[in-house]
Amino acid sequence: MTRLTVEDLNQADKERFVDAVGDVYEESPWVAKRTWSEQPFSSIDGLQQAMANTVQDASQQKQLELLRAHPDLGERTEMTDESQEEQASAGLDRLPPAQYETFQTLNDTYRDKFGFPFIMAVKDESVGTIQQAMEDRIDHSRSKEFQTALNEVNVIAALRLEELTVPRDGTQEQHA
């Protein structure tokens, strides 16, 4: 796949723009739809900041829907290709049974307390680091954790956007 440039995205009509970047926020193309009107973007970083601002400016209900669109970490259910790849890069698709049970317990405890799944940018993180973060963040207040989860969603989106676009050095890498 040819990576996109900021110029490609600035020239895109709304439909093409949403097709191109609508998946960077998990199951939430509304972020791209609302951000499209902010064109032109000075850079890919500028686009990512505009998308993060769209999330920040959304209603709390819309933000909660965005958080709830994310799968539980380590879950063995259907999820987007992006989530599968990210979780696999951290080894969450290969948890031994005892650790899988620990993750399920942490996920359930977290979701029961906060009303949304634990969210962390896990790409290339270790299972131990992720588990420790889950254990630590369960003690947060709901308001602190809500903001932490939104921040993590923006990190995930930035990493996904980076995969879709031309690197800072301008080289056109080809991806299978």
Swiss-Prot record:
The keyword S-adenosyl-L-methionine does not apply. It is an enzyme of class 4 (lyase). InterPro entries: OHCU_decarboxylase, OHCU_decarboxylase-1, OHCU_decarboxylase_sf. The active site is at 70 (proton donor). Residues 72-96 are annotated as: Disordered. Pathway: Purine metabolism; urate degradation; (S)-allantoin from urate: step 3/3. The keyword Oxidoreductase applies. Substrate binds at residues 71, 83-87, 118-122. It catalyses: 5-hydroxy-2-oxo-4-ureido-2,5-dihydro-1H-imidazole-5-carboxylate + H(+) = (S)-allantoin + CO2. GO terms for molecular function: 2-oxo-4-hydroxy-4-carboxy-5-ureidoimidazoline decarboxylase activity; oxidoreductase activity. GO terms for biological process: allantoin metabolic process; purine nucleobase metabolic process; urate catabolic process. Its EC number is 4.1.1.97. Keywords: Decarboxylase, Lyase, Oxidoreductase, Plasmid, Purine metabolism. Pfam families: OHCU_decarbox (PF09349). Catalyzes the stereoselective decarboxylation of 2-oxo-4-hydroxy-4-carboxy-5-ureidoimidazoline (OHCU) to (S)-allantoin. Belongs to the OHCU decarboxylase family. This is 2-oxo-4-hydroxy-4-carboxy-5-ureidoimidazoline decarboxylase. The lineage of its organism: Archaea, Methanobacteriati, Methanobacteriota, Stenosarchaea group, Halobacteria.
